Amino acid sequence: MATRDRVSTGSSGFDKVIDGLRLGDNVVWQVDSVADYREMVDPYVAQARADGRRLVYVRFGSHERLVTADDAQTVVFEVDPTHGFETFAMQVHNLVEQEGIGAFYVFDCLTDLLPYWHSDLMIGNFFKVTCPFLYELDTIAYFAIVRGEHTYATIAGIRETTQLLLDLYRVDDQIYIHPLKVWQRYSPTMFFPNLVRGDEAISITSSTEVAELFSSIERQSDRLDHWNVALDRAREALALPLRDQEAVKASLMRMVIGGSARMFDLCADYFTLADVLAIASREVGSGLIGGKSVGMLLARRILERDGDARFTSLIEPHDSYYIGTDVFYTYIVQNGWWPLRAKQRTADGYYTLAPELREKLLAGRFPNDLREQFMEMLEYFGQSPIIVRSSSLLEDDFGNAFAGKYESVFCVNQGSPEERYRGFEDALRLVYASTMSEEALDYRMNRGLVDRDEQMAILVQRVSGDQHDEDYFPHVAGVGNSSNLYIWDPEVDADAGMLRLVFGLGTRAVDRTVGDYAKIVCLDDPLRLPPMAYGEAKKYSQRGVDVLSLAQNTWHSRTLEEVMRHDLKADRSLFLSLDEHTATRQRERGRGATSSYLLDFRGLLTRTEFPALMRDALTLLSTAYGHPVDIEFTANLSVDNELRVNILQCRPLQTRGIGAPVSLPPIEDVRDCVFCGTGNFMGGNVRIPLERIVYVRPGEYLALGEQDRHAVARHIGRLNAALKGSSTMLIGPGRWGTTTPALGVPLRFAELCNMAVIGEVASVGSGFSPELSYGSHFFQDLVESGIFYVAIVEPNLRFNEGRIVDLPNVIADVSPESAHLAHVIHVVEVPGTEVCSDITSQRVLCR
């Protein structure tokens, strides 16, 4: 505003010194004690009440209360700093927005936030996002910080943002005020120290008096950030007996580890104070390191401690770095996006403003001090490829896996230092921006996590593997589950676990790859084949290999034949076997005995300790967690078959288990069933009553163009939303969730998350073939949501389409805007119908 009304401080002498307050002023006091701050608060509060002002006291400190609600014009707003920066800042933002124009505020001493946030940086960020908003609304607000408890950088940031910054001293029981910044006001004596006596303020202008005053005040050099002070104290505690280190360890874990009480307690059981200090020493910035980092570190520690030294020589060392959650918030605040972030957190802005915030997150600038720390980290890694991985606060904890919801970005890390640095920053921005992806937003919404503080940390890992000519990759990568949820044979031991293996980078193990298949390994019998017809082992094997191309400085996909021409620095026969079936067919066709090979890892599974090692590791981890677990890993071998395994990730596997045996009803005529027989299903023993079936007709879907197939996916998403709370089965051709419409329906998991059952139908001649992609992110979503899965492949599983399409199509009633797709999507009501399955007999039916 061009003109701002003058307001009294409650002290006429002080008013003369600073020419009074102005609407919009934020007033920051540097004090030696909260009692001194109160000396300034009391007259300000009394004056505000006398003037009939709306007075708001923001209470969060552990010190004595500064204001009481003695009248109707006074509000005491209590906010809990233990919930973290974002929740705290959002609650204050919402309060200020609600109180509107012209309110007067008193905030508790900001220094009291340090024991909760452990970082000067975040106190500065809070002030930077709150002060301008208060200014815009013509408020006046009092703040305080304790002198000597904050860094010069924090004070400089506050000085830059606030309208008034004042030093308050008590010398010989007298109060002195020394204005350091008074915005848009000036007088010849304004910036001299002033002796305050009641309503009188006397400027100390004499050089002798000023020198005597300031010489009696102890001046402190720049102070270490609270974060570094806490680390120094923790290092000193290492000299104490172990039992005396526990309290210090718990405090440091709250700064670095965080997480749910269950995960925190598990970490406390396995991490020593020295362990936590080692983690903190590799952190860039401050704040929590996030769930993915914690899970990886905890898994390694469990194997080291509980593995009786067996794993010590077999686990590949790691030298990861962690970018703390405070960096994420600082990036948003320093680029001026906090108001947009606050609006995006509202119900109206949650989806509508996310694209705008995502675009900004992709284009911001990091503060210079962080850029310097990033550069030092990259200098450490040199030209080794690295991967920049999301590690949000809620990831990989009990209850929420966030599998594949946030980005992980490979940095091949070639070129000049400047080029490598730009590549790293771009990767970091991409991970941050993925917090605003539609899939991540849907996941948080569907899991009831919208109001949870979802802070994003980053895990920076050296890519496991080696250079092979101009490519870089590990020999083996994959995912492992301690509990086998996809049992196709009564002999399978569900508790032995299962692996999904690929050669090269693990991207093919977690994504549903077009025309390619990972190797499924049951750890009770590693050579047991999954259900496939004899002679189709080649079809259901891996054909492509993901690598990092050092020459092209990018992720790349190559054919298996190309990669096998490299010097693998290991015995090829560990991975490749002669394809006897193909060789036999070639001989029968008179083509000679040309060798054909199959990537089946037979040598690895029979001639090394790899399967036994992985089975034991999964058992140890699930025992320690008290819960089934899911891991991501790599394995590398030397020319003499020496094995090293790298545990990249570990998280609780959210599963309801196999369940009690189910007695399936006798079937006199299979034509009475929607489907019936023995088949491939996941979800254990079930009896699921159905209310509706949504069926995508394969022939009609096949006739559509690619754009219309995507439209079908979007309308299934509409049906999914409309049928929430209804027990519904979704059946369609090929793979649900594929990115390739030629292989199935390309919907996102959030577009089928409310289904009770999903079925994938094989369609002869169309190219549609079911594939669960065990261990993939899509698989994890199914498990976490408790959705029953069945692959409908004849002749083992008889499918009677007429039991669906002969019933009236009610799509127009459920989703009127989808009615034009009634010829493709058939929605029927099926009261009295149920899906039943039995693990022992491997029978499954819908009748």
Where are the language model's segments positioned?
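C-terminal regions of RecA-like/P-loop NTPase motor modules
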Residues: 2-3, 185-222
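Glycine-rich P-loop/Walker A and Walker A-like loops and their local beta1-loop-alpha1 context
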Residues: 6-62
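Substrate-engagement module of ASCE P-loop NTPases
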Residues: 116-117, 122-149
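Phosphate-binding/switch region of NTP-binding enzymes
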Residues: 145-198
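Short, charged/polar "capping" segments at the starts of alpha-helices
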Residues: 37, 62-68, 150-153, 738-740
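Conserved mixed alpha/beta core segments that line enzyme active sites in large multi-domain catalysts
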Residues: 148, 264-265, 270-310, 365-763, ...
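Conserved inter-motif catalytic segment of the P-loop NTP-binding fold
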Residues: 50-115
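A conserved helix-loop-beta module that forms one wall/lid of the active-site cleft
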Residues: 276-342, 348-368
